[in-house]
Structures are given as C-alpha cells and as structure tokens.
C-alpha cells in the first residue's frame, strides 16, 4: 500500500497547549477514513494537519507526508466572497486543465449553474458548502478531507455529498471525514479514529 501521511508520535497543539498527544497514524491512498470526537477533541486540528493547512505546534512529531493533490473543505468557508462562483472555480482550479463544458455539467449537477456569475458573498451558508463540494468534484484530488461534512447542508446537499464520496470510492481516491459521530458515508472504511479515547 502507498502511504500519503504517517506519524508514530503525532502531537499537535497551539503554543504549549496540547490538543492531540502521541497519535500513531498511517493513511493510505485509495482508502477511506473517519475522524470522530466531541467538540474540542482535536478533529479540526488533525484534519488540518493531514491536509497540510495546520499552523500550530507539532512538538517535534515525526511526520511523513507525500507530495500529492489534497484538498480540504474546512468547517469555515474557504471561498472568496468578493468573487463570483465561476471566478472562485477558476482561482481554485488554476493549475487544472478543465474545460468549460465540464464545469457547466458539474455546476448543473449541483444545481449551481444559474448562480455561477453571482458573488459568493451573496450565497447562503448551504450554497457556499455545495459550491466547495462542486469544486472538489471538479478538482478530483487524490485525497479529500472534509471537516463537519453535513454542516449547512439540506437533505439534497447531503445526497450530493454522499454521491461524490461514492464516486471517489469507485475511482480509488482517498476521503477523510471529520465529525462528532460517524455519518455512515462510506461503503468501506480503513480506519475510524476516535479522538474521545
């Protein structure tokens, strides 16, 4: 199996305050993982570290990280409110070779095509989350990390998210979901990391 992230002593925190201590973790391409735990248990911190977006203290942890395409949909929106949806797509996919027809088809699938010229700042929280999921679908990274995947999504949005997860499983791409409890999104799961323990 091919690893994209591994540590035998992952310790994370902010300044001198520990959030995660001595976690042994190894993550493989083409596998699914879930991170669960109560508020404050370190779920967001861990998913940010895995996706290389963590700006806290690693306390000399031994971390192996393979250079790969990885995307994080965090608990806070990452899209730029002063840009339109289409401008955000072009910004986040600037290195990708994706044609306009593909973009239009994906936006249509997520019921966003008629909003592509609208500013993200005018979107509801649910529309912003669906837009981020649509961008993840277009980008199709080898590893997709989603923190609190169901937050802001209505029933249709949850279905669209689950369809994307299923598609990624069939394509052999890794997905990591982080929430207070399992959301049952995966048909097969390599490891569930419970940070309450």
Describe the residue ranges of each PLM region.
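Catalytic Walker B motif of ABC-type/P-loop ATPase nucleotide-binding domains
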Residues: 144-148, 153
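ABC ATPase nucleotide-binding domain signature region
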Residues: 50-94, 196
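Conserved ABC ATPase "signature" region
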Residues: 100-116
């Amino acid at each position: 199996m091919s690893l994209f992230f591994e540590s035998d002593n992952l310790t994370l925190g902010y300044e001198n305050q520990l959030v995660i201590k001595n976690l042994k973790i190894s993550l493989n391409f083409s596998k699914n993982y879930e991170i669960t735990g109560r508020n404050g248990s370190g779920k967001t911190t861990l998913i940010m570290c895995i996706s290389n977006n963590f700006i806290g203290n690693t306390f000399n942890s031994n971390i192996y990280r393979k250079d790969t395409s990885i995307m994080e949909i965090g608990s806070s929106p990452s899209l730029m409110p002063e840009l339109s949806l289409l401008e955000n797509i072009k910004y986040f996919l600037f290195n990708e070779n994706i044609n306009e027809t593909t973009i239009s088809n994906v936006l249509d699938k997520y019921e966003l095509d008629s909003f592509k010229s609208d500013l993200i700042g005018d979107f509801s929280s649910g529309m912003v989350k669906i837009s981020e999921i649509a961008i993840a679908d277009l980008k199709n990274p080898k590893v997709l990390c989603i923190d609190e995947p169901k937050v802001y999504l209505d029933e249709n949005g949850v279905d669209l998210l689950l369809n994307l997860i299923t598609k990624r499983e069939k394509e052999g791409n890794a997905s990591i979901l982080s929430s207070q409890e399992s959301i049952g999104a995966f048909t097969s799961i390599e490891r569930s990391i419970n940070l309450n323990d």
